A protein has these predicted regions:
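Active-site helical microenvironments for divalent-metal-assisted chemistry
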Residues: 1-195
Length: 195
């Protein structure tokens, strides 16, 4: 029983070239497929796996409300990013809690929503995953070698607690790299090296 949330769009990397892609274009040169909330729901249904759609929809609605009015550098509504990360997580066959955490992964970091709010609404499992993804993002470093070593340490630590945290973070980075064409050249290079 899906309510009709506000339709938003998200970019998700297509596995095949779109029909309108220039001949000979590399996958990295083609704009990712546009996915709406409705298409995400269709993909969940088409997966043939049982998902807690009430939880996933509730996570979408909270993320959509929390990020309302915020746009990415590309000009797209910010909700596009969490939707795209959730689609990548779905495509990997992950569970309802992982999809909900993917939708919520930037809410604590970027909005007034707290981990206590997430725990109250979604339980400690989802809140702990969101917290783990947030912690993987927070530390800043002065040089790339230190950053890469710390990223590896943080990934291993996250894996030891819950491998889903690392997978959500990797999906987050993957989507950011695929849609980073709006970033300045130096930021794209830095993110690529950091990842």
């Amino acid at each position: 029983h899906l309510h009709q949330p506000v339709q938003e769009t998200a970019t998700v990397a297509a596995t095949a070239q779109p029909a309108d892609a220039p001949e000979g274009a590399l996958p990295s040169e083609v704009r990712p497929e546009i996915v709406t909330w409705e298409k995400l729901c269709e993909a969940i249904k088409a997966s043939g796996r049982a998902y807690d759609m009430d939880m996933i929809e509730k996570a979408y609605n909270l993320a959509n409300d929390a990020h309302k009015g915020v746009c990415r550098r590309s000009g797209e509504p910010y909700i596009c990013h969490p939707l795209a990360v959730a689609r990548l997580v779905l495509d990997l066959g992950m569970d309802s809690e992982s999809i909900a955490a993917a939708l919520l992964h930037d809410v604590v970091e970027d909005t007034p929503t707290t981990l206590d709010d997430l725990t109250a609404q979604f339980g400690s499992e989802v809140a702990q995953m969101v917290d783990g993804v947030t912690k993987l993002t927070k530390i800043q470093f002065s040089n790339i070698e230190e950053l890469q070593a710390e990223n590896l340490r943080k990934m291993l630590l996250a894996m030891s607690r819950d491998v889903r945290v690392m997978i959500i973070k990797l999906c987050d980075r993957l989507h950011n790299m695929r849609t980073g064409d709006a970033w300045p050249e130096q930021k794209r290079r830095d993110k690529a090296r950091e990842t």
